[in-house]
Regions:
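Transmembrane-helix motifs of polytopic, lipid-linked glycan transferases
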Residues: 74, 178-199, 237
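Membrane-interface anchor segments at the N-terminal boundary of transmembrane helices
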Residues: 171-175, 416-499
Length: 562
């Protein structure tokens, strides 16, 4: 009873936390309110403005926002009260227990065991449209291009060569499937093993291992043969490395081993997806800024040289090799807003209307414009590709002019263009997973999936393991925001750096996505879920010495973390 009274009297004194708690709760409530205004009458990504549009604000919409605010604020408050009592659950009492390498293999085997029904049903995995393009490049039916990262294409080529040696492309793709499954299981196992070495309790390790094994988005992404799985895995390793830096308070940043690991991970993240370069630049800058007082000149110089080398290879060298073939580019979000204004007959001058008409016939725009998918416009003959890529400056000026005249239309267009990345209530099947073969794959390469369970037993379990409920990408970004909030509550401010690569990934997608729903773009947010529950409790190495004392003492003893 006395404990219950203490809980009721609890009052947080962290003003920054309280302020951000109100801000994040309000952001969530606003997304719920804005979602309630969207009338969506189609489950297809090609939905037109007849199928998806904004309605007028009603009392019901306002109440949805208010109720959402109250519910989220209440939940956060309950967690806020309970979270201070959870250190005993998160950490082992015996921190001097010797660390055994066989724990890694136990975790690895457990994850693979849970994945086995998926592996035996969908082996070797599903080839996506982008991967199909990479295969076409590998067999010389398309020219090599870094639009789909060339490193990923060359990785596929290595395995196709293995298939050539055996006179069977099926063997090559099977080998690639096994490789990706093994690497993904190993990376996830390494994360749990890393927590084990940080003295997290066996209970926490078991929960995370079970999550990796049971949650469908892990085995299905291990079986999704597209660039996003390896990219997110190397990005996840990069994040674990950032966490290692944080737990050592940046004292390892000048170590030769750390410099090599950090540089290699920067290179891998940059080359496995094109937005990775911006992610590592932003993250590295902040890491350097936070730990600059540690005299990390070696780290700064090494990171700078690595960034310059990456730029030199991806820029001038790739251009010389003919891998950067596009003579120009456009921002899908920007063009989508301009076309939305045109398709909805927004406010514009006759001159602006003519300019848009040159970009793409306005009458045709009204027929083919889809606010959720920009790529439905680009194939039509009326889309003037040459004009758009050579008139970037003029288009940007037009974008600003129309923004001033049509702010509401711009907000609506942007909201629909990025719908799946901010709206927790919306999820489509498009680019959610790729465990099935893309249509036409067998026309270019003789490979197929084998359902071994059906082959051996005469019955398939596809209906049992197929995705039945899809989760919005926005759920996972809000999990990160909530986790950051509790990290701030516990005053572990440097731990916030660990979230940055995932947030920057989401941010780059929000700036330039051509499609409103694509879990693969931000799959790193899913990989981050166990981290979200760990980071608020992650301590610096020097604090480990105090854990045993803290956990061993009575409840009335308090330990200062910072």
């Amino acid at each position: 009873m006395e404990k219950f009274k203490k809980i009721l009297k609890y009052k947080c004194k962290n003003k920054l936390y309280i302020f951000l708690k109100y801000i994040i709760t309000t952001i969530f409530a606003l997304t719920a309110f804005w979602d309630s205004l969207i009338n969506l009458n189609s489950d297809k990504i090609q939905a037109t403005l007849k199928d998806i549009y904004f309605t007028n604000i009603t009392f019901k919409n306002i109440m949805i926002g208010i109720i959402s605010w109250i519910i989220v604020f209440t939940i956060l408050t309950i967690i806020e009260i309970l979270i201070s009592k959870l250190d005993n659950i998160y950490y082992k009492k015996n921190i001097n227990e010797p660390k055994k390498k066989r724990v890694f293999f136990l975790i690895f085997g457990t994850i693979l065991l849970f994945w086995m029904p998926y592996i035996l049903t969908y082996f070797p995995g599903g080839i996506f449209a982008d991967t199909k393009a990479s295969i076409l490049q590998c067999i010389h039916l398309m020219e090599y291009d870094n639009a789909n990262p060339i490193v990923y294409t060359l990785l596929i080529k290595v395995f196709l060569k293995i298939g050539d040696l055996c006179n069977s492309p099926q063997i090559g793709i099977n080998a690639f499937g096994l490789f990706q499954i093994t690497i993904m299981a190993a990376v996830l196992s390494y994360f749990v093993y890393w927590l084990y070495k940080k003295n997290f309790s066996y209970f926490i390790l078991a929960i995370i291992t079970l999550f990796f094994g049971i949650f469908k988005l892990f085995p299905l992404y291990a079986l999704s043969i597209w660039k996003d799985t390896p990219f997110c895995l190397v990005l996840f390793l990069y994040i674990i490395n950032i966490a290692e830096i944080v737990t050592k308070n940046g004292k390892n940043l000048n170590d030769i081993k750390e410099l090599i690991i950090y540089s290699l991970l920067m290179i891998a993240v940059s080359f496995f997806r094109n937005n990775g370069f911006y992610i590592i630049i932003a993250t590295t800058f902040i890491v350097f800024a936070v730990y600059r007082k540690n005299k990390i000149l070696k780290f700064g110089i090494t990171a700078l040289i690595t960034i310059i080398l990456i730029y030199a290879v991806k820029g001038p060298l790739f251009t010389t090799l003919g891998l950067n073939k596009s003579s120009g580019s456009w921002n899908s979000v920007m063009l989508n807003q301009i076309f939305y204004v045109s398709a909805t007959d927004g406010n514009m001058t006759e001159e602006e209307s003519e300019f848009i008409n040159t970009m793409c016939d306005r009458n045709k725009l009204k027929e083919v414009y889809t606010p959720l998918l920009f790529d439905t416009i680009t194939p039509v003959p009326e889309f003037n590709y040459g004009f758009i890529v050579t008139h970037n400056t003029e288009i940007k000026k037009l974008w600003v002019k129309l923004l001033i005249k049509n702010p509401k239309a711009y907000l609506e267009a942007y909201s629909l263009n990025t719908l799946g990345f901010w709206d927790t209530n919306k999820a489509f099947k498009d680019a959610y997973t790729s465990h099935l073969m893309w249509k036409g794959t067998q026309d270019i390469i003789d490979v197929e999936q084998t359902d071994y369970i059906e082959k051996w037993t005469g019955k398939s379990i596809k209906n049992n393991i197929e995705v039945k409920r899809r989760y919005s990408s926005a759920i996972f970004i809000f999990l990160i925001l909530f986790s950051m909030l509790f990290t701030i509550q516990k005053k572990r401010y440097k731990n916030l750096i660990i979230y940055l690569p995932a947030i920057f990934t989401w941010g780059t997608i929000m700036l330039a996505t051509p499609i409103a729903f694509s879990m693969r773009y931000v799959y790193i947010l899913v990989l981050m879920v166990p981290f979200d529950f760990v980071i608020p409790f992650l301590k610096e190495k020097e604090q480990d010495k105090q854990i045993k004392l803290t956990l061993g003492e009575g409840e009335n003893k308090k330990w200062k973390y910072w």
